[in-house]
Amino acid sequence: MSEKELLVPLDTYLASGIHIGTQQKTKDMEKFIYRVRSDGLYVLDVRKTDERLRIAAKFLARYEPEDILAVSRRIYTMGPLEEFGKYTGIRTVAGRFVPGTLTNPAYKGFMEPEVVFISDPRVDRQALKEATEIGVPIVGLCDTEHLTSFIDLVIPTNNKGKKAVALIYYLLTREYLKNRGVITDDTKLPFTYEEFLEKAANPKYRIIIQPKDKRRRRRRRK
């Protein structure tokens, strides 16, 4: 794949840090790794990330937005995730994923999605567990240290950095809408990468105390 065929210029990908992994790797993610740096950080192959973004957008576009559920508990991902939902109509859960959301019909927030999108297999493990139990396809953002045995479609990426997650969700939003036929011209988008970046760079949350176990949990302000 030449640079001209990428979704954005290679320099844009590199500037976002989308390729910067961690100092751990798993067998599952080995095929997406380009090299290891002298400081021990594994570097992801940008072209494989680009390829998987295209595949994921086409796959998700086969579903109506209300049949997709996208979730994330990572602070810097919540804002871009909500922008993703705002422009695509896809349902999102930014923050704590309540146990039983997909498996307990008695729960008032019960949902029956046809596909689930997660931002981190480890952080979003409750959503991953429930999606696996009900047998729906799972798309996930995965870094070099993740296990992917329950992920049907892996998007290899730095899923922790502000710029990286902002770019990922910007591109997913753009490509999903293009594949759905909602937009045809990249120059006439109703949103910008900078808008997604602003949401990632300025997370709004508050700390509350859970009455049962007294644990501190971060929640987004309304």
From Swiss-Prot:
<dbReference type="InterPro" id="IPR005707">
    <property type="entry name" value="Ribosomal_uS2_euk/arc"/>
</dbReference>
<dbReference type="InterPro" id="IPR023454">
    <property type="entry name" value="Ribosomal_uS2_arc"/>
</dbReference>
<dbReference type="InterPro" id="IPR001865">
    <property type="entry name" value="Ribosomal_uS2"/>
</dbReference>
<dbReference type="GO" id="GO:0000028">
    <property type="term" value="P:ribosomal small subunit assembly"/>
</dbReference>
<dbReference type="GO" id="GO:0006412">
    <property type="term" value="P:translation"/>
</dbReference>
<comment type="similarity">
    <text>Belongs to the universal ribosomal protein uS2 family.</text>
</comment>
<dbReference type="Pfam" id="PF00318">
    <property type="entry name" value="Ribosomal_S2"/>
</dbReference>
<dbReference type="GO" id="GO:0022627">
    <property type="term" value="C:cytosolic small ribosomal subunit"/>
</dbReference>
<keyword id="KW-0687">Ribonucleoprotein</keyword>
<keyword id="KW-0689">Ribosomal protein</keyword>
<dbReference type="InterPro" id="IPR018130">
    <property type="entry name" value="Ribosomal_uS2_CS"/>
</dbReference>
<dbReference type="InterPro" id="IPR023591">
    <property type="entry name" value="Ribosomal_uS2_flav_dom_sf"/>
</dbReference>
<dbReference type="GO" id="GO:0003735">
    <property type="term" value="F:structural constituent of ribosome"/>
</dbReference>
<protein>
    <recommendedName>
        <fullName>Small ribosomal subunit protein uS2</fullName>
    </recommendedName>
</protein>
